[in-house]
Amino acid sequence: MALLFPLLAALVMTSYSPVGSLGCDLPQNHGLLSRNTLVLLHQMRRISPFLCLKDRRDFRFPQEMVKGSQLQKAHVMSVLHEMLQQIFSLFHTERSSAAWNMTLLDQLHTGLHQQLQHLETCLLQVVGEGESAGAISSPALTLRRYFQGIRVYLKEKKYSDCAWEVVRMEIMKSLFLSTNMQERLRSKDRDLGSS
């Protein structure tokens, strides 16, 4: 529990920068939507993670996708888009509706939908600039496998409260890692712009 608050604070701080610096003309409110997503996921906690220690699972988030040193805009946008699409899909089921507070869940759906629309616009622009289509398709397949593992886990655990709590924490962790990737690309773009 003590580790959760610094993680949330780091997520909020790293998502403060405007996404426009990624080379896309995304609306300024994209950073606000990202922060809201993380805050909503934090607020959705229904039970203490300590009650669910026996249910923990290593979902093997594909960290190689977010930790590379040669980041391309198309890759970053593809990873972010696919992650948000998969999170939206995961939390937009009948089973998730039964597990979570409907007001918070509706707010999460709305925020994710808005972020997806913004990222789709950005992806079209980046691909139009000639970045590799391979930089887009490879992360999508890898992330689909990762999220399929999460879905299988939920089914195995019969969509229990603890299973959903473990998944909620995993989603927050994966968003944190992708936010770090986004920040590294922003820094790289700033460094290139000042050279």
Curated annotation (Swiss-Prot):
Cited Pfam families:
Interferon
- Where does the record say this protein resides? Secreted
Query: Which GO biological process annotations does it have?
Result: adaptive immune response; B cell activation involved in immune response; cellular response to virus; defense response to virus; humoral immune response; natural killer cell activation involved in immune response; regulation of cell cycle; response to exogenous dsRNA
- The keyword Ion transport is assigned to this record: no
Entries under PROSITE patterns matching the protein: INTERFERON_A_B_D
Sorted keywords for this record are: Antiviral defense, Cytokine, Disulfide bond, Glycoprotein, Secreted, Signal
Spell out where the chain is glycosylated.
N101
A GO CC term attached to the entry: extracellular space
Cystine pairings recorded for this chain: C24-C122, C52-C162
MF terms from GO for this chain are: cytokine activity; cytokine receptor binding; type I interferon receptor binding
| Signal peptide coordinates | 1-21
Which SMART domains is this protein grouped with? Answer: IFabd (SM00076)
Q: Look up keyword Disulfide bond and say if it applies.
A: yes
InterPro entries to which the protein is assigned, alphabetical: 4_helix_cytokine-like_core (IPR009079), Interferon_alpha/beta/delta (IPR000471)
Q: What top-level branch of life does the organism fall under?
A: Eukaryota
Protein family according to the UniProt entry: Belongs to the alpha/beta interferon family.
Which PANTHER family does the entry link to?
A: INTERFERON OMEGA-1, TYPE I INTERFERON
Question: What protein name is recorded for this chain?
Answer: Interferon omega-1
Q: What is the lineage of its organism?
A: Eukaryota, Metazoa, Chordata, Craniata, Vertebrata
